[in-house]
Amino acid sequence: LPAEHQKLFNFLNSTMEPWDGPAAIAATDNEWVIVATDRNGLRPMRYTITKDNLLFAGSETGMIELNEKKIVSKGRLGPGEILGVRIEKGKIFKNKDIKNYLAKEYKHFNNQIIDLDKKFPIKNETNLFKGDQLRKLQHCFGYSLEDLELILHPMAEDAKEATGSMGDDTPLEVLSNKYRPLYHFFRQNFSQVTNPPIDSLRENKVMSLKTRFGNLGNILDFNNLTEENIYVLNSPILSNKQFEKFVSFFDKNNQVLDCTFTNEENIESSLERLKKEAEVLVRQGVTQLILSDKEVSKDKYPIPMLLCIGAVHTHLIKLKLRGYVSINAQTGEALDTHSFATLIGVGATTVNPY
């Protein structure tokens, strides 16, 4: 990928999240007519250009009968490629031409994109808790012996999610006699797959866990984009050392919200407190909110982190403040990939499962 195009995509990625499709697109704004494919190229888009300066494009060839002698070129758009016609000039612009044209306009914004992984080099990871203190916290957050042996142990040993092939006869969460964390109540409505299938490890050019902090502004108003820095991490999951460096790096732009409650409070009033505190801090210019249950003790009980993140995230969206801040979860509850995914799904930017 040419360096100038790389800069263009870095800029675009800082204004909005990528749209995966699958989609083959034909569109016009009365100045341009374009055809394009999604970044994975999962839907076909074929084109033919004739000597009469006509462009034919669609999902199939042969939609219109053409004289083969008049055909100048024909082909198929690859993943993320685009082909356009500038109506006023009567000229066809190919993929490289359009991206060269766009790259000239936005390359200077790349000075604001900072890779945090280079600033957080980790040599030795430390355990925050050991012995009885660790066991008490595991009990507090509802860890079972099965969780430790069948979920955590394989993850620690193989650095990947545990897999099993037995049937699941676990009672439904709402009918279970045993404590079940709130994460267990969240399920996919259906098995979401790509067609054709994509391997996130072997096809990492189109699959990424990269996480960004900050936003350049309104994608529809390029003339008034902010000059704030955009920070990028390779993964939304932060180890304890990484989180320590993260807090130190953002310094005064960090504020911690306590996600515990006491006998004098209840969960509902505590969530209202969190929402009000978050709103005040964002209006004061804080860019990193840390929702933490680390203050848990015999007199302070953890609120389910999913409720905390979801409440603050939704509240800030209603006030149109969400785009000004990142919400970071520091929790002892999160145990497996499902709990990480649900936290991110309800609004967390990063998760530190301390």
Each PLM stretch: what is its role?
Residues L1-T226:
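Conserved short alpha-helical segments that host acidic/polar catalytic motifs at enzyme active sites
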